[in-house]
C-alpha cells in the first residue's frame, strides 16, 4: 500500500540485487534505480512533517518495520528516530515486541551493537510514551494504536501508515500522503473542492 518508506530483510536486499544485476547486464532500469532514492525521500518527508509540529517531545509508536514483529532490520523509522535525536529532540519509543525481545535477549545484542543510542528509550508501556509526548508518530498498524486519538485528543498525530481511514479528531492529524487534514467527511469534501480549483 502507498505510504511511508519500506524496510525489513527482503525488499532492500532484493531491490539492491536487481540494480546490481541490471548494471552487470548493461540494462537501464530507471524505475528500479529510483526505488532507493524514493524510499530515502519518504523518510525525509516524515521528518519534515514531524518537525513542522514545532514540538520537541516526540513519541514513536512502533520501531520494527511492521506490526507484530520485533524485526528491526532496515526499519525506516530507526533512521527517522536517529535524525530527530541528532537534532536534539526528546524521543520515547513504544514497541512491545522489541521491548520484550530486549528483555529476553533476542534483540539485545543487535540493539547494543547497531542502536546503542536507542537503548533505554524503548518501552512496552504505550500510555507512558503517549502521556510524555507532544507529537505521536504512528509507524505501523498495531491494533493497540486504535484508541490513541480518543485517549489523547489534543496531541498532534503523524500517521505514517493511515491507521484510520476516517477519523473525527480534535487535535492535529496528518499523514505522509494525505495532508494536514482531519479524515472526516466535511474535511474530505473541502479537500475535493480545493483540488477542483487548483491548477496543475
Role assignments for model-derived ranges:
Residues 1-200:
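Structural/interface elements that position substrates and couple domains in central-metabolism enzymes
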Amino acid at each position: 500500500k502507498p505510504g511511508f518508506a519500506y524496510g525489513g530483510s527482503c525488499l532492500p536486499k532484493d531491490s539492491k540485487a536487481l540494480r546490481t544485476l541490471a548494471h552487470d547486464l548493461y540494462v537501464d532500469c530507471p524505475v528500479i534505480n529510483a526505488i532507493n532514492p524514493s524510499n530515502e525521500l519518504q523518510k525525509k518527508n516524515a521528518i519534515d512533517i514531524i518537525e513542522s509540529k514545532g514540538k520537541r517531545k516526540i513519541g514513536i509508536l512502533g520501531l520494527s518495520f511492521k506490526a507484530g514483529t520485533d524485526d528491526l532490520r532496515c526499519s525506516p523509522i530507526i533512521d527517522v528516530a536517529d535524525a530527530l535525536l541528532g537534532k536534539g529532540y526528546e524521543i520515547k519509543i513504544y514497541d512491545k515486541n522489541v521491548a520484550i525481545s530486549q528483555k529476553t535477549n533476542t534483540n539485545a545484542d543487535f540493539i547494543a551493537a547497531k542502536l546503542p543510542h536507542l537503548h533505554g528509550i524503548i518501552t512496552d508501556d504505550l500510555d507512558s510514551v503517549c502521556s510524555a509526548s507532544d507529537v505521536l508518530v504512528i509507524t505501523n498498524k498495531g491494533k493497540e494504536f486504535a484508541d490513541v486519538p480518543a485517549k489523547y485528543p489534543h496531541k498532534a498525530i503523524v500517521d505514517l501508515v493511515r491507521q484510520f481511514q476516517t477519523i473525527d479528531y480534535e487535535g492535529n492529524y496528518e499523514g505522509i500522503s494525505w495532508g494536514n487534514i482531519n479524515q472526516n467527511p466535511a474535511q474530505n469534501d473541502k479537500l475535493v473542492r480545493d483540488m477542483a480549483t487548483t491548477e496543475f
